[in-house]
Amino acid sequence: MSVPSALMKQPPIQSTAGAVPVRNEKGEISMEKVKVKRYVSGKRPDYAPMESSDEEDEEFQFIKKAKEQEAEPEEQEEDSSSDPRLRRLQNRISEDVEERLARHRKIVEPEVVGESDSEVEGDAWRLEREDSSEEEEEEIDDEEIERRRGMMRQRAQERKNEEMEVMEVEDEGRSGEESESESEYEEYTDSEDEMEPRLKPVFIRKKDRVTVQEREAEALKQKELEQEAKRMAEERRKYTLKIVEEETKKELEENKRSLAALDALNTDDENDEEEYEAWKVRELKRIKREREDREALEKEKAEIERMRNLTEEERRAELRANGKVITNKAVKGKYKFLQKYYHRGAFFMDEDEEVYKRDFSAPTLEDHFNKTILPKVMQVKNFGRSGRTKYTHLVDQDTTSFDSAWGQESAQNTKFFKQKAAGVRDVFERPSAKKRKTT
């Protein structure tokens, strides 16, 4: 049973494609439509054989090995004809055979020649022993013995080198055979791939597809980004160095200007004696001012103590005789209708300054206009603004809230007004310092 016949006996292969090439019994290839069948988990596909194909695989392997064995001699012949090392080795082997035959004629007992290093050394040792015995018998000098030993060592070394060359050639031959067998296997697998079931194509999204060009473009982009980052870092470093240099220059210029300003000061015309006299005058004035303030404070304390010791009649007579002196007494002016009021302040009024002597009751800005001619609804402060007042004046307005708690007439309010409320009781006694106990 041959391989093609075994392959042809296999059932037709089902595929998801529309049509597949199929070889018939005559060897013709034709396209046949494939019926797509539904996949069922655990069910054997229709294209899978019922029996195992181990026998066919073994038969195919046996045929393949036979072909490889037949191809080996041809390759060896070609290699031997083309490789000079093999030719030299063959010549050497023929020479060794002739020498071995000659040695067999002389030696009665047969001798086995091995190819390993230990056997070669044993042969050399036996040859040395035989040669030494012969030399002792024939009384050959030591120089001849050394010469023969050297020749034997050289011959053993040459044989070893030739064996190494043979092994290298065999390795090359094996590698060539393996490559050829791999190529044959690839061809065979390619043919098998044609006969194997075709798998369903899997869709890959466009953003997930990566080609060689895209990979190279991505690597190039990464390289450009790294170069750009290095360039930006170098620019930042240069900019930082430039800023540091500018700051250093500014500091140096500032130091130079300060030194120049100090040098520009002319202290040659100064007179220490005049400066000392001016300082003495300032110190004397300060001492005099502090003494006057201290005397004024003591005088004020003495006056307060004197006024406290006076009786009520004496105090009133003293105040009438010596009234309080007001430095910046303001004349009470007349305000216009709806004029704003400004308080001039209560501090520093004892200083004799022009600003404290001004008339603060004089109208300003819109207070110059006559607001009496305005309608009644507009005669309020800040009309049309969020801070406008509800009433023009409170003189004619009753703002009493009769709904409040303190406006109600109740027993609690009456008791409060009679006992605790100030200004509503019929008591006109002067309150004492101690709090009286009420029962």
Swiss-Prot record:
Residues 71-81, 112-122, 131-144, 178-195 have a biased composition (Acidic residues). The modification Phosphothreonine is found at T267. The keyword Acetylation applies. Keywords: Acetylation, Isopeptide bond, mRNA processing, mRNA splicing, Nucleus, Phosphoprotein, Spliceosome, Ubl conjugation. The modification Phosphoserine is found at S52, S53, S94, S116, S118, S132, S133, S361, S432. Residues 23-34, 61-70, 145-163 have a biased composition (Basic and acidic residues). One of its GO terms (biological process) is mRNA splicing, via spliceosome. Pfam families: MFAP1. Component of the spliceosome B complex. Interacts with PRPF38A (via N-terminal interaction domain). Belongs to the MFAP1 family. Involved in pre-mRNA splicing as a component of the spliceosome. PANTHER family: MICROFIBRIL-ASSOCIATED PROTEIN. This is Microfibrillar-associated protein 1A.
